[in-house]
Amino acid sequence: MTIIMVTMPSGKRFEIVYAPIVKQHVKAIDRKHHSLIKEAIEAQLQVEPDVETRNRRPLKRPVTLGAKWEIRFGPHNRFRVFYKVNYDDEQVEILAIGEKEGSQLLIGGEEVAL
């Protein structure tokens, strides 16, 4: 029998804050994915949101609304969340949530240039 121990990172927890426009972005995504999106954001961004991983990276240039980071998740990394970290308030501000279809990124149902 193999036992795998998993420990949570001991970093401080960040509060997740959503920009008002994000509500419209989520409405453009099929409802069956809403819980996956919420769970992924909470699991991956509350602790160490500014540590680069395989699916989380700093943006070379801000894509939308001043976002400095992107996280990818879901089936085939279909979903994208763009955010910035506010260290003073210990908050992660979610600025946009999109869906990648082929080479197109759709945010709020509108194509956005990468």
Model segments located where?
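Enriched for short, Lys/Arg-rich terminal
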Residues: M1-R13, Q24, S35, F73-L114
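A short, surface-exposed loop/turn module that caps and links secondary-structure elements
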Residues: Q46-F73
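N-terminal first-folded block
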Residues: V17-E52
